[in-house]
């Protein structure tokens, strides 16, 4: 298991630079066995008890000292049942889960969420992320990867309804975007007197 300062979702892509010896071993095993490894959000007080597995899609570069650049793809969500710290890297017993229902989100919610996502990108405050698949039945995962709030993303990852996730995402962005627009406007006006003009010298 790989504790990181990020949240990954199913079917989203994540580039990683692997440099620690213990994770070189873990990723090397995953490449050799074509298996998954888990990514969980790391906090100052420990790790959250849910995450998502990834598979290595491609080794982008292998360095002479064993470091590597890889491209991974999110696979399955899980909850942690127990930890095993006997190996050099963290291992865990997990239970996999998916959505409890297959009810599609209303089309109007999908369209609104996409609009919010595009606005987030235009503001320049989006987290680095892979190109979203807007046809994904679990669209919320594709769009949420751009949100910079890791605590919110961790909650969203554990939500077991696509319709519910999309509503939570819309609600979050409906509050976040106006604040960011105001911040950007203040930055634009910072060198001026607030009216788009630079203050005159004394």
Q: What residue ranges belong to the model's regions?
A:
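N-terminal low-complexity, acidic/polar interaction/targeting segments
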Residues: 1-202
């Amino acid at each position: 298991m790989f504790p990181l300062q990020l949240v990954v979702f199913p079917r989203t892509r994540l580039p990683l630079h692997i440099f620690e010896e213990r994770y070189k071993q873990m990723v090397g095993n995953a490449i050799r066995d074509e298996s998954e490894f888990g990514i969980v959000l790391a906090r100052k007080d420990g790790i959250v008890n849910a995450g998502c597995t990834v598979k290595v899609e491609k080794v982008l570069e292998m360095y002479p000292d064993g470091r590597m650049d890889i491209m991974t793809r999110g696979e399955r969500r899980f909850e942690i049942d127990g930890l095993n710290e006997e190996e050099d890297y963290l291992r865990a017993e997990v239970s996999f889960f998916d959505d409890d229902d297959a009810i599609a989100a209303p089309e109007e919610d999908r369209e609104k969420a996409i609009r919010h996502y595009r606005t987030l990108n235009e503001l320049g405050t989006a987290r680095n992320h892979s190109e979203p698949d807007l046809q994904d039945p679990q669209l919320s995962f594709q769009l949420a990867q751009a949100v910079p709030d890791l605590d919110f993303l961790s909650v969203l990852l554990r939500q077991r309804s696509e319709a519910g996730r999309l509503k939570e995402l819309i609600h979050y962005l409906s509050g976040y975007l106006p604040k960011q627009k105001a911040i950007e406007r203040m930055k634009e006006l910072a060198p001026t007197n607030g009216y788009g003009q630079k203050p005159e010298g004394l």
